[in-house]
Amino acid sequence: MYYTEESLETLKHSIDIVSVLGEYVHLKRSGADYKACCPFHDEKTPSFIVYPTRGHYHCYGCGEHGDAINFLMKQQGYSFSEAVLFLAKKFHVDLVIKTKTKESSGQDSKECLRRINKEAERFFQYCLLCLPEGGEALSYLYKRGFSLDTIDRFQIGYAPEQRVFVRAMEERGISVKQLEWAGYLSKDWFLFAQRIMFPIQDSLGYTIGFSSRRFKEGGKGGKYINSPETLLFKKSRVLYGLQFSRKRIAKEKRVILVEGQADCLQMIDFGFNCTLAAQGTSFTETHVKELVKLGVSKAYLLFDGDAAGEKASLRVGDLCQVAGIAVIVCRLPSGQDPDSFLMQRGPEELRELLDRGEDYLSFLVWHKIRSYEQFTPREKARVVEEVIQQVQHWGSPIMIHEYLRQLASLVKVPEAAVLSYLSSIKSATEDKGKKADAKEVCPDPEATAVAYKGGKASKKISPRMILEADVIRCLLFAKPEEEFVPATVRHYLSPEEFHCIEYRSIFVMAMNHYNEKHMLPSMDDMMALVWGTEAMTLLVDRRINTELMRDIVVQAIQKLLDKHWRDRKRNFCHQMGKELDSLQEYVRLSEERIKVSLVS
């Protein structure tokens, strides 16, 4: 802990818990206390009670309880330190740092940096609003749609020439050396001279850096110059606009992501106060992890209407999907960004645009299809394969299955074909080298069984099971008008030839349906009997050439009957001391052997 017990105790007695919780829940007075519907679970009758005199809350519905610090940690996702700093700032309590240690020394440096940033922020805003040289920057902001209220709300400012800035900071007790340490000066050059200044704040509202924008033609440096990284400012972790959007994001579990600071501020100013932007870099996995910490379950991507914006949507969307965040892509008209769209069409049309957004998978498929001049079957197969390569990393197996079903519908291919390709990817990754062994049929199933990994569990798959899968696969992929396959299977095989319970179930269903309606049941109906099992994975692991379907089914039946005959003979010989004492059994085995010869 960085702060003394005395200062924390002072903070505790300064906190008005009703003032804190009242920003997040609708409190109603009930005698000396307050009540509300609990923010931690769904309810219609209020059972969430706040006790002002004790500085405590308790929900008699779900049992949640604690003080203001506990509430911020649970409801807003703050760490303990963040909650303490937030409350200290809100109630104007100066926290006293403990006696110097390595940790407290670093904390002391952070406090010093916060003070420098705050003084700079106040000075920049003063320059924009009060000095003649800030008039040109103010005019530029007005033309971009920034009102005085907006400028004041977001503490937007203007940085003058270096000598003016340095002199003003020295008057406030901040030396040139400290300005260099804080990232304002670099080799005696003021990074932000004659630029519009957008403060970068953390989730608690403390200014941790600046993003500056050039507004004059011919100005020094690039269009944007951001503060260098410091003890407080880490570009890869900062989500711009979080201090204004955190409350609504925590409540609604959704976020709107945009590219630039101006876009973000205008969105928030127009009431879309669940908007965030990356800072200084493009969105990264670290940013997405921060969204997950905030409890975000859905992200709307509202990037610029150009090729770069489309590319960003593809990349950020995949990062979010992998993290378990559902993505909605909202495409702006060509050449527009959220800022210009709001200025030209207003917030209502933007809400409609957000409502019309498409899920990320549909956007991804659309993007890939559009890259081909002609969408032939070969291109369709390529799109399916490329998309599956991404989808296989999106969340739980159940969600992946749902995405694959949607993919099959979007590109109009059988679900089983999509599942088959996914299984082939997994097989190639998990079991390289074993696939060829699994295709060989040897006399002794125990000696030649192969390890097959088709799911969470690993099971020994015998050659017999592989043969049974070959037969069932023919039934699955047989064309509706195909008579030879079901008729041949029905004539030569019976349920006892199938040792795998799942394959036997498919065989029985298929034959009953064929006998009754003279056609096979749908592939989906048959696959439902084995869904989620290793039998299914083995079934869809191999592709089948439908042009050679007749030859394949005949060979599969022949091998299965031959296997069945040899297994029965081996078992019989073992039981009878390798002598065929029973003429009746010998005759029956001979008849089965004849059947094999007839098929071949």
From Swiss-Prot:
EC number assigned by the record: 2.7.7.101
Which keywords appear in this protein's UniProt record, sorted alphabetically?
A: DNA replication, DNA-binding, DNA-directed RNA polymerase, Magnesium, Metal-binding, Nucleotidyltransferase, Primosome, Transcription, Transferase, Zinc, Zinc-finger
Q: Give the catalysed reaction(s), semicolon-separated.
A: ssDNA + n NTP = ssDNA/pppN(pN)n-1 hybrid + (n-1) diphosphate
The Swiss-Prot or TrEMBL record lists the needed cofactor(s) as: Zn(2+); Mg(2+)
Tell me which residues make up the Toprim domain: 253-333
Do the record's keywords include Ligase?
no
Q: Where does Mg(2+) 1 bind?
A: 259, 304
Any single Gene Ontology cellular-component annotation: DNA-directed RNA polymerase complex
One BP annotation, GO: DNA replication, synthesis of primer
Record-linked Pfam families: DNAG_N (PF08275), Toprim_2 (PF13155), Zn_ribbon_DnaG (PF01807)
What does the entry list as the binding residues for Mg(2+) 2?
304, 306
Q: How is the cofactor bound?
A: Binds 1 zinc ion per monomer.
Q: Which GO terms describe its molecular function?
A: DNA binding; DNA-directed RNA polymerase activity; zinc ion binding
- Span of zinc fingers (CHC2-type): 38-62
Domain writeup: Contains an N-terminal zinc-binding domain, a central core domain that contains the primase activity, and a C-terminal DnaB-binding domain.
Its function, per the record, reads: RNA polymerase that catalyzes the synthesis of short RNA molecules used as primers for DNA polymerase during DNA replication.
Instruction: Give the similarity note.
Output: Belongs to the DnaG primase family.
Complex formation: Monomer. Interacts with DnaB.
- Supply the name of the protein: DNA primase
Query: What organism is recorded for this protein?
Result: Chlamydia muridarum (strain MoPn / Nigg)
